[in-house]
Amino acid sequence: MNAITKNSDLVVGYNVPAEIGMDANDVATPALIIDLDAFEKNVKLMGDFIKQKGIRHRAHAKTHKSADIALYQIEHGGACGVCCQKVSEAEAIVAGGVKDVLVSNQVVDLKKIERLAGLAKRARTIVCVDDMDNVNDLSAAAVKAGVTIECLVEIDCGAGRCGVQWGQPVVDLAKKIASSDGLTFSGIQAYQGAAQHVHDFEVRKGQIDAAVQQVTDTVAMLKAESLECDIVGGAGTGSYYFEGASGVYNEMQCGSYIFMDADYQRVLDKSGNFISEFENALFIWTSVMSKTKKDKAICDAGLKAQSVDSGLPVIFGRTDVEYIKCSDEHGVISDPDNILKLNDKLKLIPGHCDPTCNVYDWYVGIRNGKVECLWPVTARGLAF
């Protein structure tokens, strides 16, 4: 593994935020910290669900972009492999030791296709397709490299992004793949990404039910043409319990469940309660850097320390103070009772975990108030 498990020549506060054994209060801020107990519980919980349903979990590495975390999910959570969104991300994760990867996206640039074929020499490599000409390019690259690339036909099952319409367009593309040298038709990709953060349970369920019906009908049409789906993939943290019980999806692609974020705390279950089976495990560790006003404090985690596309962060475990505004390098904390002091530490739950992880080089694993491990964000910034 790539984790730093003992002190090294890295310089705390310059190129790494902490060292093994350090007290959490001494970690350089802002830092991305993981509550290891909560993280491990989340991984086990998803692993238990998958095992109970008799299906597979291909954990989505776009959340964490870390080879160490991917390997942990495989070893301790029963994941069969990982998803990545870009070729470069997949290359970094495979270089870190993962041997089964799905690029759950379209790869159409010829140079990137060439790299994808190179990846297939080192790991099981699967890619999504939604275009006949793209199949030709993938086939040519696979033949040239002497490899086999597995392909999933992507269905647009409601997200309005990539993918063909369900039914006959899927069958036509699957036939094209199956007859192309260097390629294998391995199934379908049907991820309803737009439903994951729909807060209302019945609305979310309705969107996934519609996707499940499209997938069920399409799988039947493929089977009628002797085209078997080894993978029927999709599902995310906000919907996995629907697809997992559908009887047609056999490979979940959840990512955020390991960390959770502030927006997922707004997603409701059937009873109208906030979904709480997974715990918050990811936090931005920040320090109060200025306290010149009685009713406000300024912390060192601003826009450059997080993504706020899904809203501002929530201060974990506190109701007396609130994160209310941010600029590039500063966060404004409402402190009506004048409680905070210089250098006080706060744990922020990011509004959106995935893009927040992409602005850090390191995860700092914390247990019992001490730094237990340092994991590099292996594929940080690899968006090609």
Regions found by a protein language model. Name each.
Residues 291-384:
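C-terminal accessory subdomain/extension
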Residues 150, 156-270:
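Active-site loop/helix belt of alpha/beta enzymes
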Residues 56, 222-231, 342, 357-360:
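Flexible, glycine/charged-enriched surface loops at secondary-structure junctions
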Residues 206-207, 239-318:
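Active-site loop ensemble at the mouth of alpha/beta enzyme cores that anchors a bound cofactor
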Residues 60-197:
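Active-site-proximal beta-alpha core segment in soluble small-molecule metabolic enzymes
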Residues 39, 62, 93, 153, ...:
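Conserved, mostly hydrophobic/aromatic
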Residues 1-118, 380-384:
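A charged N-terminal "starter" segment
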Residues 23-35, 100-103, 118-127, 199-209, ...:
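Glycine-rich tight-turn/loop motif centered on a GG-T
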